[in-house]
């Protein structure tokens, strides 16, 4: 439970993911102790600032012939941009604004537990992967912000790491791709112009960050970074073609229509075929809620979870799934320590009960690693449904349940999975 509810401090970097080091710069962010990504230490100028101990001392030593106020402002901006470039969690909170699901104004993007897990996969592949490309197949069942995290991360790559790095956003309907792009547009326009440019690079103070193509309404340009963002729909496959894409986000793939002219696989291929995944910072996320087992998305998910005799994954994609018990809002705290003890005793006593699902609740604890507070919530939530299957459909505990209850089958899905593995 502690891990599930753990929070990080995005401004100071305390408890934030990734390898970090402690430092203090007296006149930067109010002189607070900071935990910064170790990758920042590769910058000689940054190391010199740390050695001086403050922005003012650095300016006096290395920029004495310049107006000191302007020099300090330039160094401050340098530090902010460098921090944003190497610390996605800081950038997301400081500059990305997302819709407040409770209503009201947009809020800073503070990643939740599930989003942190996905971002760790992104960062692991970017920093330590063999090719430094980012390739994920994302199975989602509950709304935990996977698409939001994906889009902000794609924007971050275009913003700080790559110019002329074009992206393709494909949905099963034009509205789904447009919705994703609207969030992208909001993000781009909220960021100050100077942050788009390297320190010292000249630029015009123009509030326009995005421009729509004069020939195609589904294409927009991120002007300061010379990046193209194209949206497309599986119902209009030609809109998915992009000859120079380096990144793609394919959303709700399992619901792509299957026609005589265009299969879902052809639509996906049209979107990703231009992307050379051997180049660092290329990015593909194939994401969907499940829609049974008879579709290309399910087949690719199975391949991503399968390995050859040498232990190599059969797919280029790394699978990512979030069960309900890894989403922090699905817990029910106990009123007292005694109530918790009584619940544990009840759980153990009924661990072999099939009729009232005690064996399943015990499986969540012993095999799946769900928290007691999570199982407490699950048991209580089950009372809304006439049977356990209804609950498992809404809140799957693993990918097997996710695909089972999104389609129809007359066979035990776990037995089917065992048979599939035996056939490899």
Task: Annotate each predicted stretch with a short phrase.
Residues 1-424:
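Phosphate/NTP-binding elements of NTP-utilizing enzymes
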């Amino acid at each position: 439970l502690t891990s599930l509810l753990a929070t990080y401090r995005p401004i100071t970097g305390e408890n934030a993911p990734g390898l970090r080091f402690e430092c203090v710069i007296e006149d930067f962010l109010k002189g607070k102790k900071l935990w910064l990504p170790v990758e920042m230490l590769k910058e000689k100028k940054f190391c010199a600032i740390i050695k001086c101990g403050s922005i003012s001392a650095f300016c006096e030593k290395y920029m004495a012939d310049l107006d000191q106020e302007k020099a300090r402002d330039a160094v401050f901006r340098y530090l902010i941009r460098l921090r944003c470039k190497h610390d996605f969690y800081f950038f997301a909170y400081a500059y990305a604004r997302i819709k407040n699901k409770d209503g009201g104004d947009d809020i800073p993007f503070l990643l939740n537990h599930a989003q942190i897990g996905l971002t760790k996969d992104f960062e692991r592949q970017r920093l330590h992967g063999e090719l430094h490309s980012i390739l994920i197949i994302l199975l989602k069942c509950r709304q935990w912000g996977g698409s939001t995290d994906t889009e902000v991360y794609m924007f971050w790559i275009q913003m700080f790491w790559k110019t002329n790095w074009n992206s393709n956003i494909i949905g099963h309907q034009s509205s789904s791709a447009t919705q994703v792009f609207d969030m992208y547009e909001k993000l781009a326009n909220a960021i100050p112009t100077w942050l788009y440019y390297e320190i010292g690079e000249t630029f015009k103070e123009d509030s326009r960050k995005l421009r729509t193509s004069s020939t195609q309404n589904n294409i927009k340009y991120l002007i300061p970074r010379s990046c193209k963002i194209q949206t497309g729909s599986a119902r209009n496959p030609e809109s998915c073609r992009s000859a120079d894409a380096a990144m793609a986000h394919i959303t709700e793939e399992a619901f792509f229509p299957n026609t005589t002219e265009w299969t879902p696989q052809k639509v996906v291929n049209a979107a990703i075929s231009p992307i050379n995944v051997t180049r660092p910072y290329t990015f593909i996320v194939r994401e969907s809620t499940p829609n049974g087992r008879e579709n290309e998305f399910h087949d690719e998910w199975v391949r991503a979870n399968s390995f050859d005799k040498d232990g190599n994954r059969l797919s280029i994609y790394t699978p990512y799934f979030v069960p309900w018990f890894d989403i922090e809002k699905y817990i029910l705290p106990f009123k007292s320590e005694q109530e918790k003890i009584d619940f544990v005793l009840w759980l153990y006593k009924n661990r072999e009960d099939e009729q009232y699902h005690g064996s399943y609740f015990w499986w969540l604890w012993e095999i799946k690693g769900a928290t007691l507070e999570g199982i407490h919530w699950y048991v209580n939530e089950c009372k809304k449904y006439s049977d356990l299957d209804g609950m498992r459909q809404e809140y799957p505990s693993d990918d097997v349940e996710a695909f089972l209850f999104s389609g129809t089958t007359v066979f035990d899905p776990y037995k089917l999975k065992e048979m599939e593995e035996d056939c490899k």
